[in-house]
A protein has these predicted regions:
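Active-site and donor-binding regions of nucleotide-sugar-utilizing enzymes
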Residues: 5-141
Length: 141
């Protein structure tokens, strides 16, 4: 099992992640291998340009991945669940169906098996990755 994974959507998320990892490294046993975390950069909200290569050059992370997270309009089959049914219960049912289906459709785009990590840090769980984690009952911070 791997130690940690951070899923970042903004430069600020990456900044906070660096601070967390640097603190962990400072407190860690010197005999332990540094850089045991994975950093995932979601391309949905931000163009990180060459940040992936820059982060890799630091050696702070074992792995740096880009995540091509998909917006709901990428999947036209989800549109039917967004229509107003005219009733609270009908809309609630559609919302439940929407979240389940969205998580299923997003799954092929998730770049790693998140179940192989002890700790998962997600800064923005209202994005598709949050639906995926919740529907698959994967615990995260």
């Amino acid at each position: 099992m791997k130690d940690r994974i951070y899923i970042c959507h903004t430069y600020y998320h990456v900044y906070v992640t660096f601070l967390k990892e640097l603190k962990l490294r400072a407190e860690a046993d010197p005999a332990r291998k540094a850089g045991t975390a994975t950093l995932v950069l979601s391309k949905m909200s931000n163009n990180f340009e060459n940040l992936k290569a820059r982060v890799e050059s630091t050696g702070l992370f074992e792995e740096v991945l880009e995540f091509d997270e998909k917006r709901e309009d990428f999947f036209p089959e989800l549109a039917k669940y967004r229509k107003d049914t005219g009733s609270f219960l009908g809309n609630l049912k559609n919302r439940i169906r929407f979240t389940k289906e969205y998580a299923r459709l997003e799954a092929p785009y998730v770049p790693v098996d998140l179940r192989t990590y002890k700790d998962i840090y997600v800064y923005c769980d209202s994005d598709p990755i949050g639906y995926y984690l919740n529907q698959n009952r994967i615990r995260y911070h």
